[in-house]
């Protein structure tokens, strides 16, 4: 090998290798000091792109977890508020149950209603004030609210919370048929009871025998209430049109085939003859007699069989119908119609031509005065809702007009044939009660009769003995039937809140499962990113040692190579 001075190839090679070693040593020191394998795109462009994507996904999943926890917090806030509302509803139902017995007076029931009103106010207060970050939760506006729970857009869970105000919950369906005055066999079917199928009940005979009538039908309906969601009550009751007046029954007077015979009774049945005689055979007839607060005779079927009077109970008893099979009331714990069909429905007052009183009543509506329509649908009235029935004593219209004190008798200026149509006055629908039978005909006021409110003939209003019609009822639990209705409505409200809470619980569980899943996903994504981005300290330490030694040996080699060139001087000595 020749000696050259101008170009030191060995030194140049040593220098080049030293530069590479120094660069690699710098990279190794950078990795060891940062803990990252990739500190710049030059380190691993493809790996950096993948790692950045994974880092973004992990960060997004972390926020999604926070979103899910926020959603759970919202739902838990609503759930706890509704738990308090349920306690209020339990108390309302308990107080309604307390009022649903005739040991309570109007005064004590009014006190109970006042308590219920206060409880409803607090229930509404909870519904209107429960909020999260300024958003109302229980007022009905929190519907289809979305929570992002994924790393990509539109990966959401929706949550809705139903309204819980007293005007929105407890909506209960009440339907009561017309008064039934005929017997028969009923085959009742509930249409689409579950939204798809029909439910057919076993046929029931409506008659006056034991084990028949609306009581037997109600028992059949209630036996299947868990499946259909419909419960039934019955009211088989004949109420006198006026306070008991002196009279007598016929010798063949009988109730439900059991002969009671002739009884003489005085005004108000003060001697107790009529009521005692009827109650003496109540275990056989199934019919019990009593007087209401107005002194009217009340015949009540204890087991729901019909009430059939044969012979004559006497006009003084005021019983309008000698055959009565009562009214059937249906209750459903939601506001949807009860769609019925079947055979023999006229025997339960629910035939095609019968008037069925229907109403959906919310919890708030039970707080104030119960309207006539709602009261009739709830089964308050023993008779069908509608126009008033005027009850007077006479053998006929002409006979009535001829009676002294009628206002149409001699010298009054009015007569049957006066051309004024006074033979048709008897306001809306007047029942003429003769001394021989219970009811004659119904008459309607003729136009131009001159007999109306404000007509100047108002003195004739004194001839009205009684009015039987649907009318408004006092608030809530202030009546026995009202208390029963409030129990039904409170039960519906409890069911409504339980359903809302169940929906909330389902969403909470869904969110929790999602959070658990994306937490695991986030861990795995971070692990994948770490595998790509983070440095392996064991391998990198070995790598650092390698380049550190090479750097030192390179410096030594370069020094030695420069020293070799000094040998040229020896040739010149």
Swiss-Prot record:
Broad class of where this protein is predominantly found: secreted
- Give the record's GO CC terms: bacterial-type flagellum; extracellular region
Q: Which GO terms describe its molecular function?
A: structural molecule activity
Keyword Secreted tagged = yes
Report the subcellular localization: Secreted; Bacterial flagellum
Record-linked Gene3D superfamilies: 3.30.70.2120, f41 fragment of flagellin, N-terminal domain (1.20.1330.10), Flagellar export chaperone, C-terminal domain (6.10.10.10)
> Mind listing the UniProt keywords for this protein, alphabetically?
Bacterial flagellum, Secreted
The answer, when asked if Aminoacyl-tRNA synthetase is one of the entry's keywords, is no
> What InterPro entries would the database entry show?
Flagellin, Flagellin_C, Flagellin_C_sub2, Flagellin_hook_IN_motif, Flagellin_N
Q: Which family does it belong to?
A: Belongs to the bacterial flagellin family.
Q: What exactly does this protein do?
A: Flagellin is the subunit protein which polymerizes to form the filaments of bacterial flagella.
Its quaternary organisation is:
Heteromer of FlaA and FlaB. A flagellar filament composed exclusively of FlaA is indistinguishable in length from that of the wild-type and shows a slight reduction in motility. The flagellar filament composed exclusively of the FlaB is severely truncated in length and greatly reduced in motility. Thus, while both flagellins are not necessary for motility, both are required for a fully active flagellar filament.
Its name, as the record gives it, is: Flagellin B
Give the encoding gene's name.
flaB
């Amino acid at each position: 090998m020749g000696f050259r001075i101008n170009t030191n190839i060995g030194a140049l090679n040593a220098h080049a290798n030293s530069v590479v070693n120094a660069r690699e040593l710098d990279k190794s020191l950078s990795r060891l000091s940062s803990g990252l394998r990739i500190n710049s795109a030059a380190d691993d462009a493809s790996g950096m792109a993948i790692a950045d994507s994974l880092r973004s996904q992990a960060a997004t999943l972390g926020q999604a977890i926070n979103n899910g926890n926020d959603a759970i917090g919202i739902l838990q806030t609503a759930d706890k508020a509704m738990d308090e509302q349920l306690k209020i509803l339990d108390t309302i139902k308990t107080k309604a149950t307390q009022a649903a017995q005739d040991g309570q007076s109007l005064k004590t029931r009014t006190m109970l209603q006042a308590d219920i009103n206060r409880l409803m106010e607090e229930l509404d207060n909870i519904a209107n004030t429960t909020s999260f970050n300024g958003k109302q939760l229980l007022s009905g506006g929190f519907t289809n609210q979305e929570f992002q729970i994924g790393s990509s857009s539109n990966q959401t869970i929706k949550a809705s919370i139903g309204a819980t105000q007293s005007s929105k919950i407890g909506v209960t369906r009440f339907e009561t048929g017309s008064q039934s005055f005929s017997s028969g066999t009923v085959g009742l079917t509930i249409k689409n009871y579950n939204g798809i199928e029909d439910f057919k009940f076993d046929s029931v005979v409506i008659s006056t025998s034991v084990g028949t009538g609306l009581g037997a039908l109600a028992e059949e309906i209630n036996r299947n209430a868990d499946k259909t969601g419909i419960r039934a009550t019955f009211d088989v009751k004949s109420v006198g049109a006026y306070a008991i007046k002196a009279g007598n029954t016929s010798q063949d007077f009988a109730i439900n085939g059991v002969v009671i015979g002739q009884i003489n009774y005085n005004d108000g049945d003060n001697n107790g003859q009529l009521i005692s005689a009827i109650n003496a055979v109540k275990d056989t007839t199934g019919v019990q007699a009593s007087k209401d607060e107005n002194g009217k005779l009340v015949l009540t079927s204890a087991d729901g069989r019909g009430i059939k009077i044969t012979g004559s109970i006497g006009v003084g008893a005021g019983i309008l119908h000698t055959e009565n099979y009562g009214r059937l009331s249906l209750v459903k714990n939601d506001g949807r119609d009860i769609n019925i069909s079947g055979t023999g429905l006229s025997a339960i007052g629910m035939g095609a031509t019968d008037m069925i009183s229907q109403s959906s009543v919310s919890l708030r509506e039970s707080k104030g005065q119960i309207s006539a329509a709602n009261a009739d649908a709830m089964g308050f009235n023993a008779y069908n809702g509608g126009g008033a029935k005027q009850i007077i004593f006479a053998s006929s219209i002409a006979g009535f007009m001829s009676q002294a004190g009628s206002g149409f008798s001699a010298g009054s200026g009015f007569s049957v044939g006066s051309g004024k149509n006074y033979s048709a006055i008897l306001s809306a629908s007047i029942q003429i009660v003769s001394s021989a039978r219970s009811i004659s005909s119904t008459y309607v006021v003729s136009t131009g009769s001159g007999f109306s409110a404000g007509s100047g003939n108002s003195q004739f209003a004194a001839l009205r003995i009684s009015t039987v019609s649907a009318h408004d009822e006092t608030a809530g639990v202030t009546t026995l039937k009202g208390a029963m209705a409030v129990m039904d409505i409170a039960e519906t409200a409890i069911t409504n809140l339980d359903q809302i809470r169940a929906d909330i619980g389902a969403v909470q569980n869904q969110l929790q499962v999602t959070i658990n899943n994306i937490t695991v996903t986030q861990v795995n994504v971070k692990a994948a990113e770490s595998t790509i981005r983070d440095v392996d300290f064991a391998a990198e330490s070995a790598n650092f040692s390698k380049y550190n030694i090479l750097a030192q040996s390179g410096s030594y080699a370069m020094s030695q190579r420069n020293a070799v060139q000094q040998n040229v001087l020896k040739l010149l000595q």
